[in-house]
Regions:
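Acyl-donor (CoA/ACP) binding surface of acyl/acetyltransferases
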Residues: 1-36, 62, 66-168
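Conserved GNAT-fold acetyl-CoA-binding loop/helix
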Residues: 32-53
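A short helix-loop-beta-strand connector motif used in the catalytic cores of GNAT acetyltransferases and
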Residues: 52-66
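Juxtamembrane helix-loop transition sites at the ends of transmembrane segments
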Residues: 47, 53-56, 125, 160
Length: 168
């Protein structure tokens, strides 16, 4: 599948490449970025290369979220665990550097990414799993219209949104 560059008023989303290694290293070196992820903070530039290569090789996609004003990587977002077919679904993931928190940037990034998932990828359901301590992500998914399943799955909170629930 061809993943487009997505532009919003303040952001440019594009697939990460090896040329982004320094920015990816800085971003994923922040302990607050990786706190609720299943990876430790990057300690070596080669770990940034591995993150980029994982997203290039994976069956999903990961956009770098670039702040247009500062021309800087603010975070990443995208899909993984993608299945096709009549009940096509994928898990959405996202992260944002602390310097960009509280400005509504991830909401701005995810709205067109969700629309792309339904319109171009043919998804019927978009899922997310969140650590119950990650209040910002819990609030973001709720604000975007995801339904929260109160049962914890593997000690994570499960969210989902069906195509017909998206008000984007």
């Amino acid at each position: 599948m061809n993943y487009p560059v997505i532009e919003t008023d303040r952001l440019k989303l594009r697939l990460l490449t090896i040329e982004d290694r320094e920015a990816v290293f800085r971003h994923f070196s922040e302990e607050e970025v990786t706190r609720y992820m299943d990876i430790p903070p990057c300690r070596d530039i080669s770990e940034a290369d591995e993150i980029i290569q994982f997203h290039i090789d994976d069956s999903g996609c990961r956009w770098g979220v670039f702040d247009k004003q500062q021309d800087q990587l603010a975070g990443t977002c995208g899909y993984h665990c993608w299945t096709t077919g009549p009940e096509g679904k994928a898990e959405i993931g996202f992260d944002l550097s602390r310097d960009f928190w509280g400005r509504g940037l991830m909401t701005e990034a995810l709205l067109p990414v969700i629309a792309f998932g339904y319109e171009e990828m043919g998804l019927e359901v978009i899922e997310a799993t969140v650590d119950p301590g990650n209040d910002r992500s819990l609030r973001l998914l709720t604000a975007l219209g995801f339904c929260r399943d109160e049962e914890l799955v593997d000690n994570l909170v499960y969210f989902y949104m069906r195509r017909n629930q998206f008000a984007g």
